Regions:
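Serine-dependent carboxylesterase/thioesterase catalytic core
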Residues: 39-52, 56, 62-146
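Flexible, membrane-associating and regulatory peripheral segments of lipid-active enzymes
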Residues: 1-41, 51-54, 59, 64, ...
Length: 146
């Protein structure tokens, strides 16, 4: 799994802060989201962020009726096998407990993790939702083709 470019890595904290600040503007619209069907969702944070940074989205998903969980791997310190393996362990645990496929929601680098996990564990994953993830969009390597 290849990580984001150095430019994207360096600008991630700033981009995350901007995203969080726009949440305040979006709050009135969020009440129009229809209720979920109760399936499990695992949320994966972006680079240099931890599960604490995903609490707002997990709380929102829970309020909408989903079973939202954290990735439980601490701070996302980049592309590392131990973080990937740990996230897969949590995914397997959620699947075993619920008997349902799990949706993966990843913010920035977390979206790259989510996509890679889904590619390697498709029998456990319902869908992937990536938020601001730095995917390549040129030619056959485009995210729509992987």
């Amino acid at each position: 799994m290849q990580g984001p470019s150095n430019l994207l890595r360096l600008t991630e904290p700033l981009r995350a802060a901007v995203d969080l600040s726009t949440l305040t503007l979006a709050m009135p619209w969020l009440r129009f989201f229809k209720a979920g069907d109760g399936h499990p969702v695992m949320v994966i944070p972006g680079f240099t962020a931890s599960g604490r940074s995903t609490k707002i989205i997990r709380d929102f998903l829970t309020a909408r009726g989903y079973q939202a969980s954290c990735w439980e791997q601490g701070t996302n310190m980049g592309v590392r096998g131990d973080l990937y393996d740990g996230a897969v362990d949590i995914l397997e645990k959620i699947h075993a407990e619920t008997g349902l496929k799990v949706s993966l929601v990843g913010q920035s680098l977390g979206g790259i993790y989510a996509r890679e996990i889904a590619k390697r564990q498709p029998h456990l994953v319902r869908q992937v939702i990536s938020l601001g993830s730095p995917f390549n969009t040129i030619g056959s390597r485009s995210s729509k083709n992987t």
